[in-house]
Amino acid sequence: MTTLGTPLSPSATRVLLLGSGELGKEVAIELQRFGVEVIAADRYANAPAMQVAHRSHVLDMLDPAALRVLIASERPHVIVPEIEAIHTETLVALEREQGQKVIPAARAARLTMDREGIRRLAAETLGLPTSPYRFVDTAADYREAIAAVGLPCVVKPVMSSSGKGQSTLRSEADIDAAWEYAQTGGRAGAGRCIVEGFIDFDYEITLLTVRHAGGTSYCDPIGHWQQDGDYRESWQPQPMSAAALRRSQEIAKAITDDLGGWGLFGVELFVKGDEVWFSEVSPRPHDTGLVTLVSQELSEFALHARAILGLPVGAEDGGVIGQSGPSASCALLAHGNGVPVFDNVADALRDPDTALRLFGKPRVDGHRRVGVTLARADSIDAAREKARVAAAALGIQLTA
């Protein structure tokens, strides 16, 4: 797709975002830089990407009939799934029946919508190294799986994100509460879970991998720290051995080649010395990749947009995307109930080479990531500290 039209005209190039969170918002902005007409959809009104789209729709994207009605009415040239909670079988059917273009491909969206499809592909079809695992449907199966993989272990709903429904079990005392949380915290309600054994790793990375018209290219590895299964900080580049980096790229290429299509993939990996294990992959920008807003010449969102549109990404097949030096991000979390209001913004931006993104999420109920601070420095440690200081300076209030 190297010919682009004018938005809101008969020549418009229309892209439908299924999911309108903060990652979708940045993708929408990058698409609009190329004059793309952006339509944003999500299950709630005024989602972040809706605030920068040409128009928006609120619907249950797990409802196949509602999804078909939306796609028929908007007639998008390209559909870009931005979350897992989509009836992906509808996308598969539309791709097959009508040639509907889905990014990166409808099969990739279906396989990665839950942990089972992608884990079985990686471990059982491609033979990639992973943690030991079992899939379970009942409390009895769950207890058998724990006995098989051993403690400590992790339990996650097969369909969830941002740590929802996820628990780490360190003793038998954790077993019942973890099962209950897994049955209530997933995106699709009670149901199937994965029980994963622990890997003794040194660190974990996200290797952003972009499949584009010119081949496959890689970003420098992103290190990250998670709490309760959710991203808190990320930094780039993560130091690692040449052998581990080479193996990481080999694993990323194997999984993304099988999924196919064009777009950016977030490949999550565990690393110990020169050894690498596959963890997960998302066929879209990754929350840990928010650091690329300041760390790269082209952010993960710009890369995704360019790949979607068939445009050059600034790196050759097998090459590495340009990087600007040690950089870090720190997530901003709000706790409570209400509409976020931010103060001390000037203080948060006082240090040079510090940036801030406020996502525009319309409401917080419980806890929610509402923004991110970003920083560059002479070292990873210094960049992380600058991002933390900026985050601590910002005040977050919730109003009725």
Swiss-Prot record:
Quaternary structure (record): Homodimer.
Transmembrane segments: none
Pathway(s) it belongs to: Purine metabolism; IMP biosynthesis via de novo pathway; N(2)-formyl-N(1)-(5-phospho-D-ribosyl)glycinamide from N(1)-(5-phospho-D-ribosyl)glycinamide (formate route): step 1/1
Function: Involved in the de novo purine biosynthesis. Catalyzes the transfer of formate to 5-phospho-ribosyl-glycinamide (GAR), producing 5-phospho-ribosyl-N-formylglycinamide (FGAR). Formate is provided by PurU via hydrolysis of 10-formyl-tetrahydrofolate.
Positions contributing to ATP binding: R115, K156, S161, S162, G163, K164, G165, Q166, E196, G197, F198, I199, E204
Binding site for N(1)-(5-phospho-beta-D-ribosyl)glycinamide: E22, L23, E82, D287, K361, R368, R369
Protein name, as recorded: Formate-dependent phosphoribosylglycinamide formyltransferase
EC number per UniProt: 6.3.1.21
Entry-linked PROSITE patterns: ATP_GRASP
GO molecular function terms attached to this record: ATP binding; magnesium ion binding; phosphoribosylglycinamide formyltransferase 2 activity; phosphoribosylglycinamide formyltransferase activity
Residue ranges of every copy of the ATP-grasp domain listed in the record: 120-309
GO cellular component, one term: cytosol
InterPro entries for the chain: ATP-grasp, ATP-grasp_carboxylate-amine, ATP_grasp_subdomain_1, PreATP-grasp_dom_sf, PurT, PurT/PurK_preATP-grasp, PurT_C, Rudment_hybrid_motif
Source organism (scientific name): Xanthomonas oryzae pv. oryzae (strain PXO99A)
Gene Ontology biological process terms from the UniProt entry: 'de novo' IMP biosynthetic process
Source taxon at top rank: Bacteria
Reactions catalysed according to its record: N(1)-(5-phospho-beta-D-ribosyl)glycinamide + formate + ATP = N(2)-formyl-N(1)-(5-phospho-beta-D-ribosyl)glycinamide + ADP + phosphate + H(+)
Residues bound to Mg(2+): E268, E280
Similarity-based family: Belongs to the PurK/PurT family.
Keywords recorded for this protein, A-Z: ATP-binding, Ligase, Magnesium, Metal-binding, Nucleotide-binding, Purine biosynthesis
